[in-house]
């Protein structure tokens, strides 16, 4: 039977900004997007700050965006939740955190804090690290060591010195704690199974393998002199009196304070997996460690979780499933967790009637080297699916504007957007031919701002609104929409009643 599918099409990191300088979205030749914008109802959505459950003025990101999109309601994000717990004293009494503290006291061992050192608020926040230091000291933990992962991606490419100085000031004010290793997130926070990167971070933390420096500031300066910005700092060791400050040993405790799961999973696995074949962990692989993660990274990780997920009922996948509608989730590797796990409110398993297609992202060092990424392959698979009338609802993510946008390079990002536009045309025209409709929008901004006012590369997300197009004639879109309104709009287009839990509203004016 012929289907008229309704699709959610996410152009990841494709924000809306009037200024054209440094704006890859404005400068790209995108005839398909422009044609839909000219011919169909369109507007903009808020995708940052309070509108997605983040602190005011905080830029959106893919995890938060997809969670809000799938939930059809504003979802209180981990960042806000942990901030609130610190403020209200719950953090200090958190069971999992206290179990880590107790473990070190019972074993006369050390506590190690892993995580991304910045205030980017995408994967972590430096305030949470400082709160952990204060709490561990209050609770009588003898020694605490920090394994700092440098950012340079959700914040400026060379901003780690200020975060290291903030951390060193906290250490000095508390007279407690020390930095043991420093690593760029490229190594410690890989998510694409490039195990040789993770291995470098792991071996620095466990074996003190890597270049040695007495001062983390000197380490970073040496890296800059070597043309390696924060993200790419090779894992290195901090020494005192010629000896490594600390390594993770048997009976120690680890708290991984990143709250966003996807880039914390692989390193966590390296420490906790019983069965392991990705690289040789060596004779020093620590035994009997207490491993605590700030949030649930993956149910398969043998760790205690400080902030368990809040279960969400009636997310878009569940509603479609309960209505007996078939649904497809499709993306390449980099955004596959977003259209599945995050879209399903932190649930890994498929709902009945939900199918998934994963297309591998290209194995290149950085995506500016291949700006089209796997957009053509994703589209080939989807076109085949639509032609065969497989699904009533489709959730598609094009990763390119975001992943190439993170390079801070304008030209490759323009190419990325042009590749996406070509493929967007193939998908949407086919959906329209089938009598279906699409909601085309972004989860957050990025590629519309590729340079700072000073003309330096801008690699982070932004707080700008995102464009939205609903490819249905004869309807009007209301103003003031946000990401939480997308799922109700999809249900509206499918003729399905919105459940009470979805507090977002359809964008289509009644």
UniProtKB/Swiss-Prot annotation:
The organism is Listeria monocytogenes serotype 4b (strain F2365)
One family from Pfam that matches here is iPGM_N
- Name the family the entry cites: Belongs to the BPG-independent phosphoglycerate mutase family.
The note describing how and how many cofactors are bound reads: Binds 2 manganese ions per subunit.
As cofactor, the record names:
Mn(2+)
Q: Gene3D superfamilies under this entry?
A: Alkaline Phosphatase, subunit A, BPG-independent phosphoglycerate mutase, domain B
What is the name of the gene encoding this protein? Answer: gpmI
Source species taxonomy: Bacteria, Bacillati, Bacillota, Bacilli, Bacillales
Task: Specify the protein name.
Answer: 2,3-bisphosphoglycerate-independent phosphoglycerate mutase
| InterPro entries, A to Z | Alkaline_phosphatase_core_sf, BPG-indep_PGM_N, Metalloenzyme, PGAM_B_sf, Pgm_bpd_ind
Q: Which BP terms in the Gene Ontology apply to this protein?
A: glucose catabolic process; glycolytic process
